């Protein structure tokens, strides 16, 4: 679209325009003086073009990052000056007129071209509008837009309706801490920002909508991690009526496989449907985590029963896990791995090496009776050249230690599969867990999940033995999504909440809409919600999720650019009946 500022965008200029006078606009990325002739690298959202300045007066007052418009003649570059790194690398614009549209009044806080690699994150976030001019940063946000557009197209093509749910809702006692919003009209009462559209999407199913989705903003007052942005995040939220766990799996596979195959870097391998399904119990045993990274070929085995027959006291009465590795490892490697293990809190890291003659070498060898060594070789699948590491503690800690050692071995021995996106489902999560401090029973995952075995299981089984129809999608060790078959039966819901310490009145008060709606013919329904930010982080090979969000908070949940959270006036506080206490 041509206007007073530009005739075309920079990516639209080509060798076909040689000899034409055109007007372009953008930002001054760089200025180079070659003695009598100067060059400006002009950047807009789409490309970079070289501007030739032969009249020195045109360059007066021109500085980096000014917004300018330039009119001039498109010329062919000398062949020896071609720049194959940019689309306009064979042409340049001989400037006849340069006009500053947006002045730079202050010294730039950093060099835009190198901000992503050399500038501290807090400085980048304070001046995010400058940081976003960096092409690598901008490309992440453009990529994000394309992925979200594709997700919408895909879901719509599969018969899902895109529906929006409220941002101001009621606080409820599950999940992370709520962000709460005081009411002006109702003294002492509060709204909450939704941690997820959980209740609303279930109510849509009760309302008779068959398949719903939205790119949902979610708000949780929780600490940041590399794969978790504090404050808010986005998820592809979807729900289906009259659906089973397997139906949700099929949709998840179709959507994620297609988006990763379309947007993953060239040459990447993406898991084909159907994805492997790993139970929570199996995941904790074989991978030491409920977020298994299947790119790592190492597996954990349980050798607890075997070591109860041995005389190694540190293993007696404990859960013992082991990892078999076939690789050459120096003394220095073992020392570094031991240091890593003790840094986790382990008292040591026992190991055995299998020698050429089939005998063992290592600090634990003497504690394994000779008549048991063949049994152990078969149990662990040991071969000549193998090394096997041992982790022993209470079951939960042993699993954690084994998982961390598995990850460290995979990384340090370069065993992780390259250019691959390995998906799996983790299912059969425990419905309930016991708080180690209070000893009270609570929900493990989602309180609205259907327990396996229904009401009979709730009435007859130990709560800690009950499994739920809950599931996660994991990719490369990152939890992309959680979901569940929902508990749509009032009797089952009341009993489940009773076990978790909530009486019927709490259920009515905190989840009143669901409680009431489920008395009017609620259909079976199920769904999940893959995280959009995490999806894009994986596709862009970024280590920090904030790199794929346009205006993220920093790790302390602060918006350094706009100054949130900030103080408000006494009048504003009075209007919402709030008094700040020291």
Predicted segment positions?
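Class II aminoacyl-tRNA synthetase catalytic cores and aaRS-like
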Residues: 1-582
């Amino acid at each position: 679209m041509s206007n007073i500022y530009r005739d075309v965008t920079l990516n639209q200029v080509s060798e076909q325009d040689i000899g034409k006078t055109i007007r372009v606009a953008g930002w001054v990325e760089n200025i180079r003086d070659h003695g009598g002739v100067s060059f400006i690298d002009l950047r807009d959202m789409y490309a970079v073009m070289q501007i030739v300045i032969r009249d020195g007066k045109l360059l007066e007052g021109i500085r980096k990052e000014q917004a300018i418009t330039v009119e001039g003649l498109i010329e062919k570059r000398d062949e020896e000056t071609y720049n194959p790194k940019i689309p306009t690398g064979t042409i340049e614009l001989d400037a006849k007129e340069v006009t500053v549209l947006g002045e730079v009044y202050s010294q730039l806080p950093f060099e835009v071209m190198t901000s992503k690699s050399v500038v501290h994150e807090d400085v980048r976030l304070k001046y995010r509008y400058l940081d976003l001019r960096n092409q690598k940063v901008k490309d992440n946000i453009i990529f994000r837009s394309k992925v979200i557009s594709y997700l919408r197209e895909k879901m719509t093509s599969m018969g899902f309706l895109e529906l929006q749910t409220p941002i101001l809702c009621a606080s409820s006692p599950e999940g992370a801490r709520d962000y709460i919003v005081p009411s002006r009209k109702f003294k002492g009462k509060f709204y909450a920002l939704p941690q997820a559209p959980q209740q609303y999407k279930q109510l849509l199913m009760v309302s008779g909508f068959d398949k719903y989705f939205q790119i949902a903003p979610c708000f949780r007052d929780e600490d940041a991690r590399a794969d978790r942005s504090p404050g808010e995040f986005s998820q592809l939220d979807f729900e289906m009526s009259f659906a089973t766990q397997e139906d949700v799996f099929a949709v998840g596979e179709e959507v994620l496989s297609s988006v990763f195959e379309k947007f993953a870097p060239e040459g990447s391998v993406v898991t084909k449907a159907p994805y492997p399904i790993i139970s929570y119990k199996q995941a904790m045993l074989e991978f030491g985590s409920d977020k298994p990274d299947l790119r790592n070929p190492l597996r954990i085995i349980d050798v607890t029963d075997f070591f109860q027959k041995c005389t190694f006291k540190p293993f007696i009465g404990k859960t013992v896990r082991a990892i078999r590795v076939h690789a050459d490892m120096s003394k220095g490697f073992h020392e570094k791995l031991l240091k890593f293990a003790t840094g986790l809190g382990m008292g040591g890291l026992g190991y055995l090496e299998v020698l050429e003659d089939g005998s063992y070498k290592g600090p634990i060898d003497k504690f394994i009776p000779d008549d048991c060594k063949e049994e152990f070789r078969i149990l662990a699948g040991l071969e000549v050249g193998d090394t096997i590491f041992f982790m022993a503690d209470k079951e939960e800690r042993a699993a954690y230690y084994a998982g961390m050692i598995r990850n460290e071995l995979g990384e340090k021995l370069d065993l992780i599969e390259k250019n691959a996106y390995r998906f799996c489902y983790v299912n059969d999560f425990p419905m309930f867990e016991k708080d180690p401090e209070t000893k009270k029973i609570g929900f493990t995952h989602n309180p609205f999940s259907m327990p396996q075995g229904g009401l009979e299981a709730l009435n007859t089984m130990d709560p800690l033995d009950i499994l739920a129809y809950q599931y996660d999608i994991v990719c490369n060790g990152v939890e992309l999504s959680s979901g569940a078959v929902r508990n749509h039966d009032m009797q089952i819901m009341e009993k489940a909440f009773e076990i978790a310490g909530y009486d019927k009145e709490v259920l009515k008060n905190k989840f009143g809409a669901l409680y009431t709606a489920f008395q009017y013919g609620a259909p079976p329904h199920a769904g999940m919600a893959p995280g959009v930010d995490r999806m894009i982080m994986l596709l862009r090979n970024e280590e920090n999720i904030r790199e794929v969000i346009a205006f993220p908070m920093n790790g302390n949940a602060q918006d350094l650019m706009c100054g949130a959270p900030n103080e408000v006036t006494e009048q504003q506080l009075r209007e919402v009946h709030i008094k700040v206490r020291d």
